[in-house]
């Protein structure tokens, strides 16, 4: 374990000041996300989604962001999966983007709601056929007998729906509506820059600096 304790990196690529950021956190996120794309980072759209059940027992996993606007952050999944069940019990969740090459993190907290059926239908229709069939074949988070059993279900639904599978009723989108968004920029000597946007309850956002 001593080797783990010795692992460290000094951060020095950038800085973050209230005078330089967008007053709207969605504008600031868009700025950073475009920079992550321009830097050709591998899958900059990956994020950690943390949920908790009714008892407060947490779980986390990597998912893909599929939409961002003033209404919130959108992702899609199986509603009957563990995360779907936890969100039904407890709609409060957190997202984390970590762009290590840029020494940046974005942490988002808020309440999750389902997207409209129309939004879910539109995104589902844009997916490759194999992924749409997979949404039917996978009983996500449930115990299965074997890989062969999963592939048999895939063949079954492929034969049933062909090239035009509809969206399963148990599959669709969620939108996290944020009430807090933190932007983190690594700095030397662990004196990192942390700016927190909080929703004031009206139409605006308040920006504060947090101690690292």
Swiss-Prot record:
Keywords: Flavoprotein, FMN, Oxidoreductase, Pyridoxine biosynthesis
The enzyme's E.C. designation: 1.4.3.5
Catalytic activity: pyridoxamine 5'-phosphate + O2 + H2O = pyridoxal 5'-phosphate + H2O2 + NH4(+); pyridoxine 5'-phosphate + O2 = pyridoxal 5'-phosphate + H2O2
Pathway where it operates: Cofactor metabolism; pyridoxal 5'-phosphate salvage; pyridoxal 5'-phosphate from pyridoxamine 5'-phosphate: step 1/1; Cofactor metabolism; pyridoxal 5'-phosphate salvage; pyridoxal 5'-phosphate from pyridoxine 5'-phosphate: step 1/1
PANTHER family, sorted: PYRIDOXINE-5'-PHOSPHATE OXIDASE (PTHR10851:SF0), PYRIDOXINE-5-PHOSPHATE OXIDASE (PTHR10851)
Membership in a protein family: Belongs to the pyridoxamine 5'-phosphate oxidase family.
Protein known as: Pyridoxine/pyridoxamine 5'-phosphate oxidase
Organism: Paraburkholderia phymatum (strain DSM 17167 / CIP 108236 / LMG 21445 / STM815)
